[in-house]
């Protein structure tokens, strides 16, 4: 595993060293630019300004303010609320604070480096310098002045645990020293456990007490393993090593089966000459959500149930008030400390319960599901997680002697599998009987018959040995039975050595934090007992209060104290440790039982008197069976009856010192108990290091802290949070307890800041290896935020909302921005630098479920053990005789994989699919790609668009239907007015009212004979045509059109980030403004030609329509608040480059530039309107020369719709620029180093797919949106103005910024791996039934025949129609969310899918030929 980690680190080092620069922003510093690229006199001039105003040349006319939303933003920017968005925010903290930021980074790096030895520091620094810096400087030929601390970047990913030697010469103990991740006492004080609750929990788990209660394995110390002769098979040898047999045993037979407990464990059963063994390999993943959904939760004090969205991921059950805001949990249940999960009692007879509860060591949580089946599923999932957390590891091993088996009987549970039960006697002392259930999906009858015959042969022997035992038989007389009959869940690193002492077989089952099912066999060795007895004095001083409660609960338990204590995860460590927290290595190994297993009864028995123990034994003799009594004496009396076993020899000096400081420790323990248990006493006691007022004042002063590898504060950081130093608690423990994070999550830095949501909320920011967390500090608030760093796209600095504060914006994938405010610019800048450092580190580190190096090693070891076992099987039987587990034990379909679908969504018949769109070439091209995919699927697609695209469409074998409208004229309106702005709609309604009428009528005619309609919403007619034809209707578009808080509407992108509320309102306003502008003409058209009644925006419900977005989820991640009928499929690319032959002149120009060592850029703004095309051409020429690059130019701004008044002679092009007329993007962009264009959806997708940095100069429409996305992703630059100063600097940065180049290449690789057309087709299949349901709802609401001419109606019929219109039967009403409604509609659609043709036929008028007929009126 180490070589893999080293290689990964070297790869990341190589990528990061190439992009060494300031991390406070995503752009290069001005100091890194050549002097020739400094600002000139034209820095504020925009040569791409449209005609129509003299002020445009001075840059005062902004394109976004041509929209109605731009006017709102322009007016609002004059208020104090938008003062933070002034242009000075771009330079705030940039030039003045950069030296300070750099020095702080260097200072933090040096401080952290000083914590290690000078030799280590010198070695690390030399290796970094020689291995990365010099190599990169030699290969790249340049070095950026800003550097990143590699030590800070990659320190968190290394394991911090120091592995202790696993052998002690004095004791011969080989048990590893693994410290459990105990919960911080100050954060979560642990109450005295109630043993009866744990007994009930174990019964509900179906983990029988006897199955986990094993006697200590005892082997003859002088005995040796049997010789491994030449006849011993590899499988026998492997089983001997894995299960600790004395000698290799011949394998008689093996079966693939499953162990049935509270969960189903798939594995193998091996039947040897003396044992029946079971082995299951359980790889774990902690980053995948196991289950999620809505549940009701009861409050701690309020009996009312509240509805939350729950998500079970890893070891934590989190719940959220809003399922679309998963970064702000309302709370969580840490299942690492869980005891049980069980169903509640049924409140009504004959009805199964919907309530269930989860019990932890702190409290019991009560939940209520929507149905009894859902409650059962949740309980099953929770039991599985608790089972795994209590028994941490990656393999399950069970073995029991054949002679201990009492009987075997069938236990049928399901029809498709054979299940039988094996009853086994545990040992001679307790006579306990274990029951094991094994399920076979194949060969079950054969296995049952074989085992039954094997057991019957020894039935008399078993009866004589176990039912009539000899009273004087010692446990050591039969070592086989007691040492083999055990259950363990172990990681691959835990091996049982047969020739070692009995103590060596008690190695920790799990390599991480918790005890395993084998913890009942882990007992103290003599050396350990001696250390525990001395330590118990100190424990008794601080645990007196809890011990008394524990004694009382022990006497009332249904099982013996030793049994529960040895199997309890709650007793894994003392609640209050001793004051001496730095024991020596030998002491740590001697006291490992207090860290890895439950604190045994011996530690308290040494404190109590012999009378207490005797009284406890008498109570247990009277209340329990002989088994419990024997266990209690076996576990406790052996330590108390002979005190010399615990206190052998004279007391050591260390023990005398501990006993001497008893008064101080007693007082400290009492103060600790009162402080952690009582809020009132904590306010009264003056035991803290500073007063309450001083502590609060320190918190409100704000500040920052950085933490080293051991999570200690670096010396240069001021101490502003003295609470962290209290309780002897590690700095990171409190952080992990607040957010229920694993031990592998190491704290890196903390800051005090305000989080702006509705109101500013003061709290603390935590930065760890892979998380950004926030916790409110205002009394009465419980806001918490857990944000994975991999979900953060960028971090930007802005002015604060309030005067004197400094803002920081966190841009999140698929989520609205988060705004933080800091009191000082230093803290804000330091936080920005720290976040950028961690973002760079996690950028190329793919997160898996195994984060820590130790966990990776353990997983590798378990996987190696599993692989070696498989190899041994194949060596014994050959590949033809054995089938792998995944084939031989395949689950029945009742155990359905949620990731796989059980329904074939592809329709059986070929569909007639019409794609309706208007606009430019970029609007039509994606539909050609989609239709080519539909043709390959056997469907009959057709594209309805402008007539000038007909040859292009038909060239690809796609049917075509014309739609009225001149795209050139439409382009002129869009450029001059902004796309779908108020001025656009006003001019269109005045000058193009007839154009809209022709568009609607021609679209209606073109969409006839269709079974499915897919429309760009800009065409305006599709939803009404689908309602009239009563066919399923989809929408598809190249820009965001659905309401979300993550992104603003593509036509209303603000100058600065406005937050989620503004983003959402832009969609609402646009929908209403757009509909108001066309409502009159559309309703007239509906009545006259479609035969439909007038409609409104509420009746249409456009937000319920299934939507396909043809851009990449890597470019525009799906927002968390999108319903499940909205899908981002990926780009629909039309690859035409393979059929295109480039001109010779173009190839020679590219070849010449490569020989000269010059970068090549493409510049083309498409068909735009500018006031002075010649001036724009001159600007491009000067910028190319100034940036010292070569240019391939596509000059569309002077070819179409130019201003005749500005016509001037063409400017001659220098040899550095080669002009082309047209070239396929997929070919051209693969031969350049950077692309400059207008930011259209198709062109942006093509340049990003090629993996080249992209410079965007937006003009109108969605171009502003994609420009902002490119800049947020760090793969390009969005220019607000175009002049020589700005353009030349952007060209140089795009071709020289290694950071931008690497990000663009990474994004391009992800886009090329997508198949947007195939994903879109599958989305159509999946949502087709849902779309049919919506069509049925609309047809019921309209209930009018397909006739453009209204038929004569009676008064009653007219009144009935009016009732239908008023009722709005198909409008969604209620509190259901979109996702809930979609699920209900899907369920209804599945049951009613076959009714649609009959209903459509019944609703049609006589003589109709069906939905696809043409209207006679046309």
UniProtKB/Swiss-Prot annotation:
Which residues does the annotation say bind UDP-alpha-D-glucose? 920-921, 923, 1223, 1225, 1238, 1242-1243, 1262-1263
Q: Where is the composition biased (Acidic residues)?
A: 1358-1379
What EC numbers are recorded for this enzyme?
Answer: 2.4.1.-, 2.4.1.173
Cellular component GO terms held in the UniProt record: phagophore assembly site membrane
User: What CDD domains does the record point to?
Assistant: GT1_Gtf-like, PH-GRAM1_AGT26, PH-GRAM2_AGT26
* Compositionally biased intervals (Basic and acidic residues): 1-16, 35-44, 95-105, 127-139, 147-166, 578-598, 615-633, 1380-1391
Free-text note regarding domains: The GRAM and PH domains are required for the localization of ATG26 to the preautophagosomal structure (PAS) and are involved in autophagy.
| Name under which the protein is recorded | Sterol 3-beta-glucosyltransferase
Highest classification ranks of the organism: Eukaryota, Fungi, Dikarya, Ascomycota, Pezizomycotina
